[in-house]
Amino acid sequence: MNICVYCSSSDQVCDEFKQLAAEFGKWMAHEGHTLVYGGATGGLMSAVAEGVANAGGDIIGIIPDCIIEKGRKSDLPTELFVVGDMAERKSMMKEYSDVFVVFPGGFGTLDEMFDTISACMVGEHDKLTILFNPDNFWMGLLLQLDKILKSGLGYKFTRNGNLKVVDTLDGLKEEIIKNENE
């Protein structure tokens, strides 16, 4: 299974989140899953890719020219696609992935997640998105999402169970295994 991970590339992210990302990457490789990610260095992006690489797994990186120009291209992907811009990157990530996992991150992570959710709502795909919420990182966002859903504005997306929220790494693994077996 190709698992897309959206996450922070900031080196200011806490060590706890880096450890979780590395552990998840290691688990992915041991289970025979392929990481699909943004192909850049730093923060959780490096942690998850290093976890996969150190365990002998496969990595698909999809990186736009503008990030390469900043010297942020990772050497870890076993397959690397260079694209023209962020929109093309998101499109390819959706195409190459079977499930999406959202680790803690900032505006780029949110952009990727909402793009994926919106694409699901309009029928471009019916793939699962899992919001990983360690240490209640996404609590404020979850309150707003709950308000959106209660107002009926996100019905199409959640009706099919395409958005899951998990608080632990074990919970994340369980959701992926369930999705794989469906």
State where each predicted segment sits.
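Active-site/ligand-binding-proximal alpha/beta "capping" segment
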Residues: E88-E124, I130, E182
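Short, glycine/charged-rich beta-strand-loop motifs at protein surfaces that mediate ligand recognition
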Residues: T129-D135
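A cross-family phosphate/adenosyl-ligand binding-site feature
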Residues: M1-Y96, D135-N181
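A generic structural signal for well-ordered coil/turn residues at beta-strand boundaries
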Residues: H125-D126, R159
